[in-house]
Each structure stands twice: as structure tokens, then as C-alpha cells.
């Protein structure tokens, strides 16, 4: 069973920000933000044509500054948020803003490759997530499955919940909380849980993971020394409400049950350098992607701690011939394993993410501007489905 070759797209600038176009459920589309100090920065809208195995792209100018983080609205295909650096008075400040792309680009009408003269279009600024004295913004996360009207920004030691007004033209600060403790505590990343009616957010700061209740903005759990060094990223299991994954500079990926945070449920040690990004598959939560500055992307099968630890079970009632029943998948838990290691990158892989429209396809981005689109191996796909 021949697997499709990876598809590689090169940006002319360095890049570390990647997101799927979350509200798009039909087309496979990713957004990539660049990091250039000398030239105007860009957002590349990457359309993947699955049938022909080719990439089409559009380029939007992001003149506000180099992009450190990008996230897409879960409700509106044309709306996105960026965290970017701007320099004023020889001082660098990390800001955040919400933008709208031109209407005709929301659904991927793309420039023809034969037309090099086609000019990049600009983004429309909807609003700044202006936190005043709160500090440098590390990331912006949208309320999952929401109407695109609630976002959280993490700025230095502050977690800020914003209500976006109609048409997102203004952001109103609804509530906030601050990290308390010794030293200069700073958030590095965060994720909004799709469970518990979307009332929980998890954050990483230094080596600690924390859970927050968005209604009271109070801390609900704390995992100190979750990693031996800085925590870089985290993600929630989409199917198991108390499970989350984290990764960090100790080269490890850890899986946690937030009801018992004394030790991780599982630890992976497959990378040889800092792990920058971890993502659960949106549909099949045993599939976990990680990207690292060892320049590798690893796809792991964490089936023992997934929502289907015994595989896809068939009810006795569904089997017409009892004699055939012994051929069904065994009721022993399946073994966790590394499915594949992808080595198309030659630089640090800062971001990995699954396509929102196809559960078997994912993208990875390395600092040299190389975006690689890969698929879950066919044999595993059919093993999961059948």
C-alpha cells in the first residue's frame, strides 16, 4: 500500500507561526505567518489540493511586524489573530490584534502560479487586544466551538479574557487574572479546553502547567515541575475531558489526567532536542503529533490512553455469526508506538497542526520557512477505521 509523498512549500522568509483555518470544514487550508526584521511580513494562505497533491497559495501583507503566533476564528473563515513584535523607540513590544482577510480569499480563490506579478493584498485591522500595561503577548486562543466572540490573550504574567463586539471591531476586556509567585513569571503558551462547556483554559509558565476557570478567573489545578525545563506547548484531548498533553525543553512529551496531577499518565522521550509543539488529532485522539528543534516530526499512536484503548470494538449484537466474532479486534489494550518519524525538515520545527477538514492530513513548519504537508500512513488509517 503506497503512501503519498509529502508535499513541500517554501516561504522566502523565516517562519514559526502556523494554524489551520479552523472554521473551514470542506477545504484543506493552513495559514502561515513569517518572521522578517528587514521586509514586510506576510501571511501565506496555503490551499492543499488533495486530488492532485499540489499547493495553491495567496499572500497577505502583515506590515505590523514579525509574527510569533497565529490563530484562526472557529466561526468566521475570514478572521484571525496574530501576536507580533513591533519596535518603537528602539524598544521591542509584543502586541496582539484581530484581522480580517479580503472576502475573496476566505474560500481560497488563489493566484495563478503563472502570474508572478500578482500583488499581495493587505489585512484589514479589526481591533487591537490592547492590554496597556499588562506586558508582552505570547499567544491568543479562541473559545473552541464558539461564535468567535471570546478570546483569551496571555501577556507576561496576565491572562486576559476578551469579548469581541459585533463584527469584531472592538475588544472589551471582560475579566483577567495574574500569576502570583516569586520572580518574573511569564506565560509561554495556553489552550482552551473544548470540554466543561468551554469554561477551562490551561496555561504554561516556566516549568508549570495551570488550569483556570474562565467564569471566576481562578486557578483550578496546578502541575508544578511538569517538565524539567521550560514548557513550550500543550493541547487537550478532544475526546477525554480530563486529559492533556504537554511538551518542553527537556525533550519530553507528557500526558496528564488533571484529576490527579502528581505524576503524568505517560511520558514520551522520542525527540533529542526541545519539543516545541504537540497536537492531538481532532477525531482520533490516539494520534499525537510533535515537532522539535531536532528537525523531526513524530506521529505517535497513544492508543492505551485514548478514548478507544481496545481499538474499534464491535458490539455482540452487531455480529450475525458468533463463529466470526473471534476475528474481531481483541479486547486486550493495544500497544502505544511511534507510527512514523518525518525528516523532511532541515531546521527547527516550531509548529505542527492537523487540517481542520481532513483528519488524516497534517502540516509542519520549520524556521527556514519550509512547510511540509503529510498524511497518516494508509495502513494505520484503515486499521483505525475498519
UniProtKB/Swiss-Prot annotation:
PTM-bearing positions, type Phosphoserine: 320
Keyword Thylakoid: no
Biased composition (Basic and acidic residues): 322-332
InterPro entries membership: EIPR1, WD40/YVTN_repeat-like_dom_sf, WD40_repeat_CS, WD40_repeat_dom_sf, WD40_rpt
Repeat positions for WD: 132-172, 182-222, 226-266, 270-310, 344-384
Principal location: Golgi
GO BP term, example: protein ubiquitination
Gene3D superfamilies: YVTN repeat-like/Quinoprotein amine dehydrogenase (2.130.10.10)
Cellular location(s): Golgi apparatus, trans-Golgi network
Known tissue expression: Ubiquitous. Highly expressed in brain, adipose tissue, spleen and kidney (at protein level).
Keyword annotations from UniProtKB, A to Z: Acetylation, Golgi apparatus, Phosphoprotein, Repeat, WD repeat
Subunit structure: Interacts with two multisubunit tethering complexes: EARP composed of VPS50, VPS51, VPS52 and VPS53 subunits and GARP complex composed of VPS51, VPS52, VPS53 and VPS54 subunits. Interacts with SNAP29.
Function: Acts as a component of endosomal retrieval machinery that is involved in protein transport from early endosomes to either recycling endosomes or the trans-Golgi network. Mediates the recruitment of Golgi-associated retrograde protein (GARP) complex to the trans-Golgi network and controls early endosome-to-Golgi transport of internalized protein. Promotes the recycling of internalized transferrin receptor (TFRC) to the plasma membrane through interaction with endosome-associated recycling protein (EARP) complex.
Name of this chain's protein: EARP and GARP complex-interacting protein 1
Gene: Eipr1
Amino acid at each position: 500500500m503506497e503512501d503519498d509523498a509529502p508535499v513541500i512549500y517554501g516561504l522566502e522568509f523565516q517562519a514559526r507561526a502556523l494554524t489551520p483555518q479552523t472554521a473551514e470544514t470542506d477545504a484543506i487550508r493552513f495559514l502561515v505567518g513569517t518572521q522578517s526584521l528587514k521586509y514586510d511580513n506576510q501571511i501565506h494562505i496555503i490551499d492543499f489540493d488533495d486530488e492532485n497533491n499540489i499547493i495553491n497559495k495567496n499572500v497577505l501583507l502583515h506590515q505590523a511586524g514579525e509574527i510569533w503566533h497565529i490563530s484562526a476564528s472557529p466561526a468566521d473563515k475570514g478572521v484571525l489573530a496574530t501576536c507580533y513584535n513591533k519596535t518603537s523607540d528602539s524598544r521591542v513590544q509584543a502586541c496582539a490584534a484581530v484581522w480580517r482577510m479580503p472576502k475573496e480569499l476566505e474560500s481560497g480563490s488563489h493566484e495563478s502560479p503563472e502570474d508572478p506579478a500578482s500583488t499581495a493584498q493587505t489585512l484589514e485591522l479589526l481591533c487591537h487586544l490592547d492590554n496597556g500595561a499588562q506586558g508582552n503577548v505570547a499567544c491568543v486562543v479562541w473559545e473552541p466551538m464558539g461564535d468567535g466572540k471570546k478570546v483569551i490573550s496571555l501577556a507576561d504574567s496576565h491572562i486576559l479574557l476578551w469579548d469581541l463586539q459585533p463584527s469584531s471591531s472592538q475588544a472589551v476586556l471582560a475579566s483577567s487574572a495574574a500569576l502570583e509567585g516569586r520572580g518574573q513569571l511569564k506565560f509561554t503558551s495556553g489552550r482552551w479546553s473544548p470540554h466543561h462547556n468551554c469554561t477551562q483554559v490551561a496555561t504554561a509558565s516556566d516549568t508549570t502547567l495551570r488550569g483556570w476557570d474562565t467564569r471566576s478567573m481562578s486557578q483550578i489545578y496546578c502541575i508544578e515541575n511538569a517538565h524539567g525545563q521550560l514548557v513550550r506547548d500543550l493541547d487537550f484531548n478532544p475526546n477525554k475531558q480530563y486529559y492533556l498533553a504537554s511538551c518542553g525543553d527537556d525533550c519530553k512529551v507528557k500526558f496528564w489526567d488533571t484529576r490527579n496531577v502528581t505524576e503524568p499518565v505517560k511520558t514520551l522521550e522520542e525527540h533529542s532536542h526541545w519539543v516545541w509543539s504537540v497536537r492531538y488529532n481532532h477525531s482520533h485522539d490516539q494520534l499525537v503529533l510533535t515537532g522539535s528543534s531536532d528537525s523531526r516530526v513524530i506521529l505517535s499512536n497513544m492508543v492505551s490512553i485514548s478514548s478507544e484503548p481496545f481499538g474499534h470494538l464491535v458490539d455482540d449484537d452487531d455480529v450475525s455469526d458468533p463463529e466470526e466474532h473471534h476475528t474481531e479486534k481483541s479486547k486486550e489494550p493495544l500497544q502505544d508506538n511511534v507510527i512514523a518519524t518525518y525528516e523532511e525538515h532541515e531546521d527547527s520545527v516550531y509548529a505542527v497542526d492537523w487540517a481542520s477538514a481532513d483528519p488524516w492530513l497534517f502540516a509542519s513548519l520549520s524556521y527556514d520557512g519550509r512547510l511540509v504537508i503529510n498524511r497518516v500512513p494508509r495502513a494505520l488509517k484503515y486499521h483505525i477505521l475498519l
